[in-house]
C-alpha cells in the first residue's frame, strides 16, 4: 500500500541447489497443478485492479487516480474509518495513484503471485492476499492515520513476507531468492518519498504470520485456515484501534 510505485525485482523461479526432498516433491505437485489450472487467482486480482482503476477514471477521477466517486468512497483515511467506514481497510488495496503506480504493483504481482499460488493452492493464496492487505492497512494507519493511502502493495508485501517465511523453513518457492526480493524492495520503500512504510511493513508481517500458520499446520488445513483468518481479524481490530 503506497503513495508511489514500489520497487521491482523479478524472482528467479529456477530450482535452487540444496533443497530437501520434501520441497522438491512440493514443487513438482505445484507445477502439475499449475499446468492443469493456471494461476487464475493472480490473473483475476490483476484484472480486478485494472478494472477498478478504469472505473475510477469513468467516475470522475483524474489520471493520477484521485477524486471521483470510487476514490472518495474507497481510499484509506483514518478519520472516516473511525466514523464506521471500515470497508476502506480492504477497498483501498484496489485503488491506485495513476497508471504507473498500478502498473508497477501489477507487474510485481505478476512475477511473484503464481509461484505462491502454486504452492498454497488457489483458496489459501487468495486468503493470504486479503489478510496481507488488511495487515497493510493496519500498518498504514499506525504510521500515518491522517494520510490518504491506496494501493495493492500492502498485499503484495504480504506475499513477499510469506515467501521469506517459507524460505526460512526450507521451502524455496522462489528458488532461494525471497530474501533478496525483500531487501531490494525495502531499499525502495525507505528511499522513495511518499511510500507508505507502515503499509509495506504491516503487509510483510501479516503475510509472514499467515505463511507460518499455513506451513506449520499443513496437516490440519481447517485449523490453518482459521488461524490465517484470525490474523485478518486481528489486523482489522488493530487498524480500528488506531483511529
Predicted regions and their residues:
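A detector for small-residue-rich transmembrane helices and their helix-helix packing motifs
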Residues: 3-243
Amino acid at each position: 500500500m503506497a503513495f508511489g510505485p514500489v520497487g521491482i525485482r523479478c524472482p528467479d523461479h529456477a530450482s535452487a541447489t540444496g533443497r530437501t526432498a520434501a520441497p522438491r516433491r512440493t514443487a513438482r505437485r505445484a507445477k502439475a497443478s499449475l499446468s492443469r489450472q493456471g494461476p487464475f487467482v493472480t490473473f483475476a486480482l490483476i484484472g480486478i485492479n485494472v478494472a477498478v482503476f478504469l472505473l475510477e477514471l469513468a467516475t470522475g477521477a483524474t489520471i493520477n487516480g484521485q477524486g471521483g466517486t470510487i476514490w472518495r468512497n474507497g481510499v484509506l483515511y483514518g478519520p472516516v474509518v473511525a466514523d464506521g467506514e471500515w470497508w476502506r481497510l480492504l477497498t483501498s488495496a484496489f485503488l491506485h495513484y495513476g497508471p504507473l503506480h498500478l502498473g508497477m504493483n501489477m507487474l510485481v504481482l505478476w512475477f511473484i503471485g503464481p509461484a505462491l499460488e502454486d504452492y498454497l493452492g488457489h483458496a489459501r493464496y487468495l486468503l493470504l492476499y486479503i489478510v496481507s492487505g488488511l495487515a497493510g492497512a493496519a500498518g498504514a494507519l499506525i504510521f500515518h492515520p491522517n494520510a490518504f493511502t491506496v494501493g495493492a502493495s500492502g498485499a503484495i508485501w504480504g506475499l513477499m513476507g510469506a515467501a521469506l517465511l517459507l524460505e526460512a523453513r526450507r521451502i524455496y518457492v522462489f528458488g532461494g531468492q525471497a530474501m533478496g526480493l525483500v531487501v531490494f524492495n525495502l531499499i525502495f520503500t525507505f528511499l522513495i518519498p511518499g511510500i507508505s512504510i507502515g503499509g509495506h511493513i504491516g503487509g510483510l508481517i501479516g503475510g509472514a504470520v499467515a505463511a507460518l500458520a499455513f506451513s506449520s499446520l499443513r496437516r490440519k488445513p481447517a485449523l490453518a485456515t482459521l488461524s490465517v483468518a484470525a490474523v485478518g481479524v486481528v489486523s482489522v481490530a488493530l487498524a480500528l484501534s488506531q483511529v
